[in-house]
A protein has these predicted regions:
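Accessible peptide chain termini
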Residues: 1-2, 34
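Serine residues within intrinsically disordered or low-complexity segments
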Residues: 2-4, 11
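Short Gly/Ser/Thr- and charged-rich N-terminal loops/segments
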Residues: 4, 19-21
Length: 268
């Protein structure tokens, strides 16, 4: 299985995909789309930092780049309504679509929470020289990823205009994403998966407007007091040892629970 982007093909199991979902679609570089369904251009405006308020104690969650639905499954167990979107029709995905084409009208509700786990392929340190010169894209797929990410951020902006108390979380393994210009207006935390019960260290950045969620203290490489597997580059331990991007992209249940519980903490 492979993804074609311009003249290039990327294998579904190519390690350069990092946590990507192994896209089946023919996806081509397209210019960033402006927000539809609104006459207000909020692309360059700072986002409000809102306290989460879910009126009925459950609320609605949109899960973008959902893959294995790590967050969505936990949210459903808490009684939330979940709409899961991905490039591929994995199990229990509600809408399979090129997320650059997704519009707010495609989602059956206004979300209280948005979780997004965009493809890290072109931002990961292991493949950065293939795809970028610093933050500038040099591959077709890097251009595509930037366009997709700018687009879903525009959807977050649009939902926030309708529901200013909505909280959002954007997740990506620690890498070049934190340097991208379109991410600079967001508050960023860094978590280590091992502190949430995972056997991988996997330092991961999470951007959010939540004032409630506070991540656990970070671990560090070579920490002999932690259970995480040593995973030097090229080894078969840690995230690199997981077979397929679907498994590599799974988020620790304890982290998902913490995110969801913090999002419903301020329910009236």
């Amino acid at each position: 299985m492979s993804l074609s982007v311009g003249k290039n093909k990327i294998s579904y199991n190519d390690p350069r995909l990092c946590e990507g979902q192994g896209l089946e679609l023919q996806i081509f570089n397209k210019p960033q789309k402006m927000i539809r369904n609104t006459n207000v251009d909020v692309t360059n405006k700072a986002l409000p930092f809102a306290k989460p308020m879910l009126a009925d104690g459950t609320g609605n969650l949109v899960e973008l780049f959902a893959g294995s639905r790590s967050v969505g499954s936990v949210a459903e167990a808490k009684g939330m309504n979940v709409f899961s979107v991905d490039w591929q029709k994995f199990d229990k995905i509600d809408l399979a679509i090129d997320i650059e084409e997704l519009q707010t009208k495609d989602v059956p509700f206004i979300p209280d929470v948005v979780w997004a786990s965009p493809d890290c392929t072109t931002y990961t340190i292991a493949a950065i020289s293939t795809h970028r010169n610093g933050t500038e894209p040099k591959s077709d797929y890097a251009k595509k990823c930037d366009a997709v990410n700018k687009h879903f951020i525009s959807l977050i902006d649009e939902w926030l205009l309708i529901n200013p108390k909505m909280v959002f979380f954007i997740e990506n393994p620690r890498g070049m994403m934190r340097k991208m210009p379109f991410m600079q207006r967001f508050k960023r935390h860094t978590v280590w998966y091992c502190t949430y019960g995972d056997d991988r260290a996997k330092p991961t950045d999470i951007w959010t407007n939540s004032e409630v969620w506070q991540p656990r203290p970070m671990c560090h490489n070579g920490n002999k007091n932690c259970h995480h597997q040593p995973a030097p580059r090229g080894s078969k331990t840690g995230t690199q040892g997981k077979k397929g991007s679907y498994n590599r992209s799974k988020i620790p249940t304890e982290l998902c629970q913490e995110i969801i519980e913090s999002s419903i903490l301020a329910v009236v």
